[in-house]
Amino acid sequence: RDSXVTIVPLRNMRDIVYVGXITIGTP
């Protein structure tokens, strides 16, 4: 159960970083 709880935040963090990289990459 703990592993599932840790995987969700990591996934959300990855999406945020991915979107953030695109926003910063675009002028």
UniProtKB/Swiss-Prot annotation:
The organs and tissues expressing this protein are described as: Placenta.
Any one of the GO BP annotations: proteolysis
Q: How is it modified after translation?
A: Glycosylated.
- Under which EC number(s) is this enzyme classified? 3.4.23.-
Q: Report keywords, A-Z.
A: Aspartyl protease, Glycoprotein, Hydrolase, Protease
Q: Name one GO molecular function term.
A: aspartic-type endopeptidase activity
Superkingdom of source? Eukaryota
Any stretches that span the bilayer, and where are they?
A: none
What is stated as this protein's family in its record?
Answer: Belongs to the peptidase A1 family.
What protein name is recorded for this chain? Pregnancy-associated glycoprotein 62
Protein source organism:
Capra hircus
